Amino acid sequence: MSISIETLEGLQRRVTITVAADKIEAAYKEQLKGYAKNARVDGFRKGKVPHAIIEQRFGLAARQDVLSDEMQRAFFDAVIAEKINLAGRPTFTPNNYQPGQEFSFTATFEVFPEVELKGLENIEVEKPVVEITEADLDKMIDVLRKQQATWAESQAAAQAEDRVVIDFVGSVDGEEFEGGKATDFTLAMGQDRMIPGFEEGIVGHKAGEQFDIDVTFPEEYHAENLKGKAAKFAITLKKVENIVLPELTEEFVKKFGSAKTVEDLRAEIKKNMQRELKNAVTARVKNQVINGLIAQNEIEVPAAAVAEEVDVLRRQAVQRFGGKPEMAAQLPAELFEADAKRRVQVGLLLSTVIGTNELKVDEKRVEETIAEIASAYEQPAEVVAHYAKNRQLTENIRNVVLEEQAVEVVLAKAKVTEKATSFDEVMAQQAQG
């Protein structure tokens, strides 16, 4: 077998492979034997059909099978022999072939780029340094109290975090618009559910009052006919309610986890906050490292690899929204191409870090990661056992750990500055992605 490789545009390659005639003929004879064993021809018993008749009837199909199989086999032998870093499926083109002669064909394909990492020392990373304060804990406690809150009717003027019951009618240029009217609408204020200016216009008014609110719909508002439009809402304020938070008693505490005292609850909450904070800081640092890697190492990515990643993202999107699997192909590829390209870039760069530094998965760290995940559940031992039984779940954690190890290698060479940051700020940035 002879092999010649041409470099085409970008990452495209074309290989020409020639297979010896005797190898093709030997495979052809074996293929005919297979046909002969199962062929049914009138006048002959199964398996007893003369060779000449078998060849006459099935020779063309047998040769086509042989040539197709040989292209696959010879190509992947060439990939191994030439150490080709194949990306995606090849396109085969057979040359003219005559029985008894050697067989040649071409295969066009893409390869992954050869990546040589550079500029790691130029990557800048800002690492948040956070101390969870008593005030942070108090806020979390208040969140739990609000989940168990009750409401008491008030005759006082409405405040920013009150709950109100209103009737309203909205109009633009004096004309009511669709969806702008409601009766006995309950609004818990302070949650940014309404357009800017709406809740602020209610603050200061008492139950029984009627008044107008002037607002402007945001330019990004979902209804095309209302974007950027000035509107007036006629409001009837029917009821104002103040929030009543439960006292921090043992009875209240027992509603959350295994805590028995307020001190236990605070300790449990702090532990959860520390876990969330660690994950958020790790994710933020990793994102900066990856952004830096991409900025310092512009690499061309194979279109085939991007297309495969697009398909993965399509399927994930359909699954996330509960659609049928066949819907994935209907989603426009351009919706996912930027993310797909980035994922391929990240995969190539981190793989290069791993290979260059001969990194191996830290198995102890895998166990610690699984234990940390399990600690968030009521029965952590059962979660650990579930991972132990599920090879794919464990493999996912191993991949995450290996990526973290790669990020740490880059981080050790990068310019890292620490910045004092609040817990709320870090978590808000995490929520924004």
From Swiss-Prot:
Any one GO cellular component localisation term in the record: cytoplasm
Keyword Repeat: no
UniProt-listed Enzyme Commission number(s): 5.2.1.8
Record's function text: Involved in protein export. Acts as a chaperone by maintaining the newly synthesized protein in an open conformation. Functions as a peptidyl-prolyl cis-trans isomerase.
Protein name as catalogued: Trigger factor
Residues spanning the membrane: none
Listed Gene3D superfamilies: 3.10.50.40, Trigger factor ribosome-binding domain, Trigger factor, C-terminal domain
Gene: tig
Written domain comment of the UniProt record: Consists of 3 domains; the N-terminus binds the ribosome, the middle domain has PPIase activity, while the C-terminus has intrinsic chaperone activity on its own.
Matches recorded under NCBIfam families: tig
Record keyword Isomerase present: yes
PROSITE patterns per the UniProt record, alphabetical: FKBP_PPIASE (PS50059)
